[in-house]
Amino acid sequence: MKKYHLFTLLFLSMLTSSAIGQAYDYCDTKTLKDSCKDYIDKPYKYDASNIILVTLQKKAQMKEVELPMFMGESYKLIFNTYALPPGVEIHVYNKDADHDNRKELFSCNSSGAKKMFVFDTEHFHSKLYVDYVIPANRAAADGSMPTVQGCAVMVVAYK
């Protein structure tokens, strides 16, 4: 019985690690994250990072990430969009998508030549919301839908 449980546990862990490895095959997140850290200069210190995996679908998508902040602290958000497909927009807001009166604090786009973006928070908020607006996948000339994937890395630093 113990061998059965051990075998099952081993099989599940291999299956899980295989699935995780496949999810990141198209995205070298460590390299992207390390390049973001190069933009952290004193007196800022590394706090956290976020990886967003993107697969273009038939319809446009929006993914929102909530960032809790400490009131009175200054933050720096560093975005690396080298591995994003063209057309993905990144917007930073003071409120979530459910609020009509939210204010856009920062935005950038993955389509241009510039791929590294830095946002220094001069406003003190308890939370920031990062919205990734992902365009719809366009069909190829033969009508097939090619798989378009990518990722972005956001690093948060505080002062």
Region annotations inferred by a language model:
Residues 22-43, 123-159:
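C-terminal edge strands of extracellular/lumenal beta-sandwich accessory domains
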Residues 64-67, 73-82, 130-132:
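Hydrophobic beta-strand segments within beta-rich accessory/binding domains
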Residues 4-15:
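Sec-dependent N-terminal signal peptides
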Residues 74, 85-89, 150-151:
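Exposed beta-strand and adjacent loop surfaces of beta-rich binding modules
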Residues 49-53, 98-107:
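Surface-exposed loop/edge segments in extracytoplasmic proteins
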Residues 110-125:
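Beta-sandwich interaction modules
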Residues 84-99:
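Short, surface-exposed beta-strand/strand-loop-strand elements in extracellular ectodomains
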Residues 48-70, 74:
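Non-catalytic, beta-strand-enriched accessory regions in extracellular/secretory proteins
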